Amino acid sequence: MVQAKLRIKTTGIDHVVLWVKDLERSKRFYIDLLGMTIAHESEWQTFLWCGTQQIALFDATRRDHEIHAATELNHMALLMEPASYEEAKARIEEEGITTRGRQGDPTCLYFDDPDGHGLQLLYKGHDE
């Protein structure tokens, strides 16, 4: 009889790490523009609350340890309230940030952070 292998049961995402070129600039972007709050920080990293998950900004100039991926992030999708979509889009464009949509989907908003990481804003009930 073949014994079944243990299936690891994940329960959610704790945090996502983004390497950033300027930690202070990135903190201002995610806090001032996207409304995140600081969970905790050190000299070379800042963890931000995004709902119940965290986004960690790591200072790329201190990328001297070996734990880092060799691949790039495609994009990170952030949930928002449906009623604030148009206001959020206007605020992002007011900052001079180029936004992109998905053809045939006027409620899907893509843009880049200061380091070129792809971001998407969407709201619950919206199909990815």
What do these predicted ranges mean?
Residues 1-7, 13-21, 49, 66-128, ...:
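Vicinal oxygen chelate
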Residues 1-24, 75-76, 127-128:
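N-terminal beta-strand motif that seeds the catalytic metal site of vicinal oxygen chelate
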Residues 2-5, 34, 62-65:
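A generic local structural motif
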Residues 37-70, 112, 118-125:
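Conserved short beta-strand elements that form part of the metal-binding/catalytic scaffold
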Residues 22-37:
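Amphipathic alpha-helical segments
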